[in-house]
């Protein structure tokens, strides 16, 4: 029994503690949905705490926030790949939002570099956004067109922010976070990771 328990993910064990199965004894499907949702929340909270805890301890909090917000700003409408395993997701998050800010924090960029980089990013948004996954197919051509348009507008807004911000090192961190999102929507990344691209085609 102890061996089995040890193999159960921490998030699942915490979800079992937080919700009472007895209250859902007449609705097994409802219980599983609530439990799954709670597990996702717990996983994200723990991952967030780990990433930002390390960033805080290492003095990288501002750098981590800059890279992360730039990434999330573009990801909101362009979507892209997700890691299929929690451990992989956590390790990738640490590399993207702790290691990368550490490496690039003291590298300055000028506005010509910003314009060139965001020109490349905008082109990728035009060509590849939004990119879906097997678990989240983006169904509906008009829906995808709307997301693409919003992703491109978001890119232009972020370009303006990067151009206007007076700190050369901050410009670099904004570009790093944005390029991470470009990688997540590029079909070459899907191919290298052997993930299915254009998953919506299966449903249309």
Curated annotation (Swiss-Prot):
It holds the Pfam family AgrB. Keywords: Cell membrane, Hydrolase, Membrane, Protease, Quorum sensing, Transmembrane, Transmembrane helix. This is Putative AgrB-like protein. The keyword Membrane applies. Its EC number is 3.4.-.-. It is an enzyme of class 3 (hydrolase). The chain crosses the membrane at residues 52-74, 87-107, 111-131, 151-168, 173-190. It is found in: Cell membrane. It comes from the Bacteria. Belongs to the AgrB family. GO terms for biological process: proteolysis; quorum sensing. The keyword Thylakoid does not apply. Its main location: membrane. GO terms for molecular function: peptidase activity. GO terms for cellular component: plasma membrane. It is a multi-pass membrane protein. May be involved in the proteolytic processing of a quorum sensing system signal molecule precursor. InterPro entries: AgrB.
